C-alpha cells in the first residue's frame, strides 16, 4: 500500500492470491468467479519504477496523478466503471475523461467521512459526492446514505488495520460471521 497500512494488493497477497499473473489467468478467474484483481505492476511496469517516489510523497501526505491513472488504464477495458478520486476537485475532470475514453457509463465518487478528510471511495460515514458519465451523465451531486436505505456509521469504524487484522476480518466476513464488518446501529 502507498497510503495506508494495508491496501487491496497487500490483502490479496496475504490471502495467497498471486498478483503477477498473465491475462489468461485473469480471464479464467473472471469467467469462473466473476472476480479478478489487476495489480498495476503486472500490466504497467512504470508503476513499479515510480513506486519509491510515490511512497516518499505519500509519507508527506501527497497524492500523485498515478493514483488517478491506474483505474483509467484498466487492462480489462470495462464498459462501465465506478472510480473513486482522492479530491473532490478531480470528480468533474475525471468523469469527463472517462466519458472520452469510450466507456458506456459509470460514476466518479469521493467520500468525506468527517470534515477536512477525504476518501477515494464511497463512505458509510459523512457525505459522498458523485458525477456520472456516459449513460449516467445526468446523475451527479451528493449522496446521502438515508436516501439509499443505508445506515450511517462512525468514521472510526472505517479505519483499516494491519494486514493480519484485515485478513482476519475478511475471513470472518467470507464465512458469514455476523460480527464481522461495520457494526450496525
Where in the sequence are the language-model features?
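Active-site-proximal loop->helix
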Residues: 2-18
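A short acidic, glycine/proline-enriched capping/turn motif at secondary-structure boundaries
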Residues: 1-2, 44
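Glycine-rich anion-binding loops and their surrounding alpha/beta cores
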Residues: 13-20, 25-185
Amino acid at each position: 500500500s502507498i497510503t495506508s497500512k494495508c491496501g487491496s494488493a497487500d490483502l490479496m497477497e496475504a490471502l495467497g492470491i498471486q498478483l503477477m499473473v498473465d491475462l489468461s489467468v485473469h480471464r479464467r478467474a473472471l469467467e469462473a468467479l466473476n472476480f479478478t484483481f489487476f495489480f498495476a505492476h503486472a500490466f504497467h511496469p512504470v508503476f513499479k519504477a515510480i513506486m519509491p517516489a510515490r511512497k516518499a510523497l505519500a509519507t508527506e501526505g501527497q497524492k500523485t496523478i498515478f493514483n488517478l491513472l491506474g483505474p483509467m488504464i484498466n487492462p480489462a477495458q470495462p464498459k462501465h466503471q465506478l472510480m473513486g478520486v482522492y479530491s473532490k476537485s478531480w470528480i468533474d475532470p475525471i468523469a469527463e475523461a472517462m466519458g472520452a475514453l469510450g466507456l458506456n457509463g459509470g460514476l466518479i465518487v469521493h467520500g468525506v467521512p468527517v470534515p477536512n478528510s477525504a476518501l477515494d471511495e464511497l463512505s458509510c460515514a459523512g457525505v459522498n459526492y458523485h458525477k456520472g458519465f456516459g449513460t449516467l451523465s445526468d446523475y451527479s451531486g451528493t449522496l446521502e446514505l438515508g436516501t439509499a436505505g443505508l445506515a450511517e456509521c462512525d468514521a472510526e469504524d472505517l479505519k483499516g488495520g494491519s494486514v493480519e487484522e484485515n485478513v482476519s476480518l475478511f475471513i470472518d466476513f467470507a464465512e458469514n460471521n455476523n460480527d464481522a464488518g461495520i457494526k450496525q446501529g
